[in-house]
Amino acid sequence: MERSSVEKAAATPNPTPGENKNKNTTSNSKKQRPGPCGWLREHRVSLLTRHKRRLVEVPYTATIADTANALQANCVSAMVVAAPPGRWIGAGGTMILESDPATGAVRKHYIGMVTMLDILVHIAEAGVKGGGKWEEMDLNQSMMVPVSSVIGHSLEGLSLWTLNPNTSIMDCMETFSKGVHRALVPIGSQTDNSLPVELVESSPGYKMVTQMDVIRFLQESSHELKDILSSSIQALDAINENVFAVAKNTKVDEVIKTMRAASLTAVPVVDADGVELLQDGRGKRVVETFSASDLRDCPMAQLQSWLGLTVTEFKEKVGALKATLTPEGGTAISDVQQSPKLITSFPENSLKEVTEMVVVNHVHRVWVVDRQSLLLGLVSLTDILRAVRESALKMDQDMQGIVSQ
């Protein structure tokens, strides 16, 4: 027989005050969302590589010319170099191996990474050995040496990094905020308690994760980091004021030597004369960007004859050449692979706006200017990741301080 509502109430024991408190605590904990720091720790590096292609590589016997062509064909600025196992010491003492998925036998050893900057440095050194007379230098012969001979020409090539796929985005950002631009991530790793950065690794295959991948992830998840990304780059101390520039009438060969000497991957081109090849760019009007990737866009057949051009002339010729070419699919290269535009920001722009600039335009740095378009500094991908990470840590520390009071 159906009990009355009074009987039901009497049959139901009243919760004690302690039980009410526990229920409220449980309910609140379910509703409480993690802060930026906790959210970045919850997400893993494997999320960044989910839709990425397998590693693009070149054999250690490939020539520098072959490598430059491969970089251009794949629209990348760096490739790993593979060699037979047991013959080489990996860059930085690393042992990054690829094994057969069926037998586990090691079949490749990744001995290092070669970037466009390495090739740029090699070209610069060839020019120095040739007495600085580029028109008399046999560039073709210099480009026929094995790519293994240029590993480590730039600081980035001196080491090869791997990240465990279970590494948190937060730990990944710590590595990338220190100037590491890219790292290999093993496919199918089941290790949960591995160190974030590995020196020894063996896997059936790898994918590459870059600073840009992390920036793109942050930009797509901006609602989770709105308290950080809504702040200005000036307030977040994300602007690097140490910016070196070259004048627009500087010749490409001189710029290459200058970038090599200063270990720079890119320089702003400013509207100035000056007697110094590399000058303080602050307070000057920026008109162009010249980077190691610009050499990737220049066909090897034209490179030597174009080294004597000014930076602006070189950029114009490369842009005009690409506009006349059509890859498979019928789309003009000018529509899909044009050299990056000159991207600038004001100090008061939010970090969200700057991340959108680098993602949409696929550039690795944004020049910061004042209202008169005079250069104040730059914000690189490294600066963005450092600013987000430090802000997330500070917010977490502030929250811990409030809770402990």
Residue locations for each model-derived region?
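Tandem CBS (Cystathionine beta-synthase) repeat/Bateman regulatory domains
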Residues: 1-405
